Swiss-Prot record:
It comes from Drosophila pseudoobscura pseudoobscura. Residues 1-35 are lumenal. This is Neuropathy target esterase sws. Its main location: endoplasmic reticulum. The lineage of its organism: Eukaryota, Metazoa, Ecdysozoa, Arthropoda, Hexapoda. Its EC number is 3.1.1.5. Residues 1389-1420, 1452-1483 have a biased composition (Basic and acidic residues). The active site is at S977 (nucleophile), D1097 (proton acceptor). Keywords: Developmental protein, Endoplasmic reticulum, Hydrolase, Lipid degradation, Lipid metabolism, Membrane, Neurogenesis, Phosphoprotein, Transmembrane, Transmembrane helix.
Amino acid sequence: MDVLELLRVSGSNMYYSTFLADAWCYYISNQITMTMYLYCALGVLSMLFIGWFVYFKRLARLRLRHEIARSLSAVTMASGGDLRGPRFRKRDKMLFYGRRMLRKMKNVSGQMYSSGKGYKRRAVIRFARRILQLRRENMPLEVRTVEPPAEYLEETMEGSDRVPPDALYMLQSIRIFGHFEKPIFLRLCKHTQLLELMGGDYLFKITDPDDSVYIVQSGMINVYISNADGSTLSLKTVRKGESVTSLLSFIDVLSGNPSYYKTVTAKAIEKSVVIRLPMAAFQEVFKDSPDVMIRVIQVIMIRLQRVLFTALRNYLGLNAELVQNHMRFKGSSQGAGPSVYCSQTTRQATGSASATASAAAASGTAGSTHTAVPRPASSLSRYSQDEQHTLSDPNPGIPNLELSGDSVNTLFGEVNGGARLNSYPPLYHQRESDGNLSTRRGSITQQEQPEVGPVPSIDMRLVKSSAVDSLRKELGLPEQDAHIIDPFVEVREMEPNVTLITEGNADDVCVWFVMTGTLAVYQGNADATRIKQDKTDLLIHYVHPGEIVGGLAMLTGEASAYTIRSRNHSRVAFIRRAAIYQIMRQRPRIVLDLGNGVVRRLSPLVRQCDYALDWIFLESGRALYRQDESSDSTYIVLSGRMRSVITHPGGKKEIVGEYGKGDLVGIVEMITETSRTTTVMAVRDSELAKLPEGLFNAIKLRYPIVVTKLISFLSHRFLGSMQTRTTTGAPGAPVEANPVTHKYSTVALVPITDDVPLTPFTYELYHSLCAIGPVLRLTSDLARKQLGMNIFDASNEYRLTSWLAQQEDRNIITLYQCDNALSPWTQRCMRQADVVLIVGLGDHSHLVGKFEREIDRLALRTQKELVLLYPETASSKPANTLSWLNARPWVTKHHHVLCVKRIFTRKSQYRINDLYSRVLLSEPNMHSDFSRLARWLTGNSIGLVLGGGGARGAAHIGMLKAIQEAGIPIDMVGGVSIGALMGALWCSERNITTVTQKAREWSKKMTKWFLQLLDLTYPITSMFSGREFNKTIHETFGDVNIEDLWIPYFTLTTDITASCHRIHTNGSLWRYVRSSMSLSGYMPPLCDPKDGHLLLDGGYVNNLPGHLWRYCRASMSIAGVFPPFCDYRDGHLLLDGCYTNNVPADVMHNLGAAHIIAIDVGSQDDTDLTNYGDDLSGWWLLYKKWNPFTAPVKVPDLPDIQSRLAYVSCVRQLEEVKNSDYCEYIRPPIDKYKTLAFGSFDEIRDVGYVFGKNYFEGMAKAGRLGRFNQWFSKEPPKRGNHASLNEYTFIDLAQIVCRLPETYGLNPSDLFSEDEDCDGYISEPTTLNTDVRRYQVPRGGNSLSLSETEMDMDSDVEMDLKMERKMDKATQSTPPLQSKAQILRRKHSKEEARHEWEIKREQKQELAREQELERERELSQKGTTAGATGYTPNAVIATQTSLIFMDEEDEMDKKKTKDNDRDEVRGSAEDKGKEKEEDKENRSNTNNETKNYL
């Protein structure tokens, strides 16, 4: 509200323009100073007189007592006796006089409340209470403010004292290679050596063999890099407990290729002790445990992709610099060039007749890599058009090589007549649009080429034979093992610009070998330092004939990290992923050859970075670095969550921020070379990549583009910090006001009691999250079915953590549904969770159970949020939330969720899955509480900020209606002054009709002038006492707390006790709304009961920001109009929040809102003032004012100056909000309405509605409304984005190769258990049926929440199903009822049958292999073998066909068995249901007969 406008009430306002009011204000303004001094003098004289009187009375009484005591002592001495009688003790006096007073009060109260008597006495007492304010209010219940435990802000200092330091350091260093069992670790320890180095001694030098892992036990080692000019540059400093090793050199040593240091040197800075572990020790271990070797290779490849590539590509902008771009020649050690294919196949096809052409082709390709093989002139025109679409190289560092792929394609692809072989089904897909790719800048120049005769026909069998031979060499297999890969090799012919595989696709992962032509490898422009990502792909490198690609994705088991396209006409040979894994079972060593192929392709830069980059694993509570330590490195969070805590000089700790997956930690301190300003610790188990400062300097010198990336990153970070200036300096700032990122990757769901419907709740939340992005729901059953029943054992720690990390990487958020007991899965969920949602029933008891306390003990540092569920009934509203929060001081935030009827329906687990299989196919309701919770978890919340402006705040109601019609959800609400009132109404009701009705009634009460006159008081602090104003707000809200509102709400007030603004997110609603409306001069500040601080209108500092009405009243405490409101918590005086921030959008942004709509209805000051010079005369102003013939001047008067001074902070905050990118600032045209024009409520509301409707329609046409009402994707998400768990399974190569116990997938029969026969909720988590993919398909429909009609439809469907089943039972024989024990026995027999079926299947496969080998031997003896493989195509086809038929028969038998079991279980369940229905009907009939008899 505006003080100046209140002092300038126009004559048009009929309620305040009376003569009596004007005379009263004029008299008070002139006489207030004299009256104040007079009363002060009278008060001082009165105090002096009273003090003098009391002093002399006290002195006289003391003299009298002294005389009496002296007389008694004289008498006692004379008589020699004791004259003391019975003593009247003080306690007895208090009891005596207390009883007398109570008897009198009882008589008085009896007279007052007797019928028709004591009326005058009651009136006098009521008048006295009103004047003297003797009324006593019961203070409301408030949230107990409990400091978080010490573990929440402190690191864990517990050390591993039982482990020797050298063993501990070694264990931590080799952890990068994966998990080792204890016997293997002890065998590795036997090979360790201790090296003692003095300062300046070399640990290793250039040309030394790179065959060891070095671990620093004490001292410091400096690792240098040597440049070409002979200069050296420090790469990193290795301290105690750290290691020096290279993962790429480790693969070289295992592959048998000796590696030497070429540019890296290590020297001791001081006296040091280093542990040396030879890599040959691993070879000895791997001979006995091949599964360990394969697992180590897989871990190294995963670390290479997640650490090296993530750091260098996403944060330093290096893409093509990571791969060597060279062409392999004929003399290469692995594979052969295209000339070899030409000469070999030509000789085999035509013998000596075509030797001349073959030799010419061979000499043409071997002589120069840039010379094309001659081709017929007729084909030039054909290829010239295709070559125009060949992609150019956007990176000038990569040579644009013109290869002979097209001519070789002519030799292989075009036979007599020019027909191409297209007999194979296409694996690839042609791109529909190549608009994101740049076309070639220049055409190919046609050179003079000699004519060549006709090319002879080529047999595709020989082409495949050549491909098999080349792939065999690439995989490191001997010649006699060619038959192993022959059945799996496929050959395809590619047109130009054909996509073989796309980035992020896990379905078509293959090992590609280029026979002719060229493949181009691209990667998306994923720059972590940019806000808007480019959709263009970056060219990484070319794959030339004789080279292989795809080994990295094959070894990691993850999706492809690149997009591969054909650059021109090409022929490729490939082996699919499943085939590679089958080959690995027979020849595990191909894992090393694939890994070696990946390593050979990397550039020297990657090898140098491999020495500097470190992979760090931090357990929960461990510190990454501490405050005031030196900053020599930065860190990238790969997985987990980190918390930054600052320690103030007084010892108090405060949260500065939290970091999630993909965040960069400590970059500013490292670049500015300052010490660490905070302590960063792990909230949960986390993986990080460490980038030392020396590596940054080395890369900056070689690639200046890195500097640009760092500047861009720092600029965006500083810009974001400026726009999200924190408000933690205020005493009332909540924990959420800290700049903590409210975006979580993993969420654990924990039920408070067994009757909580956790599975339906998880499904509903999963349904809403699917509209935002890819999400995954994990349960204990699903983990066991995917990874085995023993997956939670300690020996399977690596498999479980790797699988969970893979799922988290592929989804924006992962839901961990915990068990109802403290099981290993529940403990794992606590270790993996970024936030824990504690789910309870709002209408049940708030007591804390033992299980919940154990959860708090397991996750001390993890943020916990309370979710209370309420049924969808007309009378259900949140209540008693304070009791829930006080019983759980560890909860940082709470959510009220209104649930549809289907969540509380008591159904079996099978029926719940069946119900949500249909629900998940529909669109979620974006206005539901589940969608609001989903947006909060993913950091996409939408906030609404309502500013102050007096009666102009009626426009907020119209804007709310327009927002609702525009389809914009509201997740958070904040308000100041009148905005606090309107926002609180919306959060309480969420119905625009009810909100409008209550706001209109309150506005009518504000127009009753006689009530305002009765509220006038002597204007020492304010003009009004605020009693009637408090009454109107209290009647509007009642005794409601802010915690009981449906939508998260806050109001902002001005604390004049602490001289700052305060944010209120809990407490009495009406009081803080009242204090936010306490405009200075009109209403006294509200005294905060918490600390006694005086609170004024929050608009004085920020005009856009317990029992509910108290804080609403505090937010409306206009200074001078109403007295400041005293906070019932601390006693601070609160005034209107408009003095500090009239539109607190910045506060809303700090509380977690990503998109904000700010509505400002405040008055605008006139800035067009008159320049009157250096001095100003009041007489001159008076002359200008009264002279009608002079030009008017605009000079602010005293009240105007005071008002402008009060709103200085508010105006500054408002300008920052207008210029921010996260806020949509809206100001309706309501300037013509005065601050106190409450009688024009409907008119102002209509103005706001019409303006808001037109405004949002304009935003929709401009395409700017999507970020508010279209938070889910318009297009159906692709299969890769919403893939099911079966599509993204963790590939454990060790399990595949070494034939470890296999796990079972999701079978339909596994979804049926004995729990289905029970009534009520089955809290044990489970999964959907087999077709999980269709539940993640985009929804089709309008709403998630089912209406009554939809619920009836569901019930009708269920009734139809029941009738169909009854009809089936009527025609068929009803199976007998089965007990639970029988079901358990049948389940056990099913498992045995499945085991027997698998044994038979393996026996059939072994028999087929034996028959195949016998057939091969027979064919070899007859001399009818083809090529070097000893294998006929017909035999291969026959063998494969027999295997396929056997598999189909097995699958049919298995499916038939499962269908029978499912029918039996369903039949038993239906029979039980029928029996229960019959019993229920019999009981009801018996009751009716009894009633009739009575």
